[in-house]
Amino acid sequence: MFVYINKIFLLFPVFIFSNVQDSIQKIDLDNVIVKSTKINSNKKEIPLSVSIKNFRDERNYNSQSSFSDFTRNTPGLFTSSSNNFSQDLRISIRGFGARSAFGIRGIKLIVDGIPETTPDGQSQLDNLPLGLVSSVEILRGPNANLYGNSSGGVISINTLSDSSEKHSRYSGIFGAYQYQSLQRTRVIDWNTSSLIIHYDKRRSNGYRDQSGYKSDILNLKYINDLDNKNKIVWQINYTDSPYAYDAGGLKLNEVENDRRQARKNNIDYDTYEKVKHLKTGVSWNHKRNENSFFDSYFFYQKRDFFTKLPFNF
């Protein structure tokens, strides 16, 4: 009889604790809408590999010297040559684009709905206004073919479109090797439309000899909400980079001797590039109902490019 009572006593505290109410606080997170999948969808409901990065509050806390600052800690994405402003940033997604000698190949780049990738598959980001980047969507895997042939991945970049931000903003970023980025953003808001003006002046002498660059970027974006179902966006971007020097590669013994020196051929041939880039485009968005919409865009680009290579033809 004593043993039976002892067993009941041991079980009794278990029933007491099992009736304690759960004290874990529950937090409801806002839905994340993905726009790079052609149809706006909830991130939890799409069977795709998508990464979304929002920089609305964070863009003022990075150097903004390269687009690689906006793609850190993204699975399957690798960047290199972020400090070589002559050969520009190289990006690969799951191996696509890794064999590119310079620039970006095999990956579709879209800025505010307008393709930044040329018909031959080459992409450049030297005209991207980094101070206006508000969000980045990265689509990996074979579903990137929704955006065209040979798309090993898609990077959709959205710039500032919210006129509720500060109507005038000045910012200055300074770093080592005489790096400076002076930016001014002006937002003019009307009843149903707004105009965003952004100017970025960037300079740097570079870590190595013959690796400095100079760039001026002007970006205008006009947004007009015609009614509840129609919206028109007009934008123009102009970039003037009179020089971006290329220091070239070094051998191991040259690195051990002086890692900041430039390759001799690059100095002898004065290797650099010069770019003037103009892009303008108009997009129209028509929303028929909650389940269907129509997007159309027209754009024009002109790129004046000059470069000097470290060898004879």
Feature locations, PLM:
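Transmembrane beta-barrel wall of Gram-negative outer-membrane proteins
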Residues: F174-R203, R208-D246, T271-N289
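Short acidic/polar hinge/loop motifs at secondary-structure boundaries
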Residues: T79, G106-I107, I114-R140
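Extracytoplasmic beta-strand/coil segments of soluble accessory domains associated
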Residues: S68-I114, S283
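Outer-membrane beta-barrel translocator domains and adjoining extracellular loop/strand segments
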Residues: Q183, R208-K214, Y245-L252, Y297, ...
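Transmembrane beta-strand segments of Gram-negative outer membrane beta-barrel proteins
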Residues: N31, S134-S135, G153-V154, T159-F174, ...
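N-terminal periplasmic "start-of-domain" segments of outer-membrane beta-barrel proteins
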Residues: N31-Y61, D88-S92, I107
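N-terminal periplasmic accessory domains that precede
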Residues: F67-F70, R90-R94, I107-V111, Q124-D126, ...
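Extracytoplasmic loops and strand-loop junctions of Gram-negative outer membrane beta-barrel proteins
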Residues: P119, I138-L139, K166-R169, K201-G206, ...
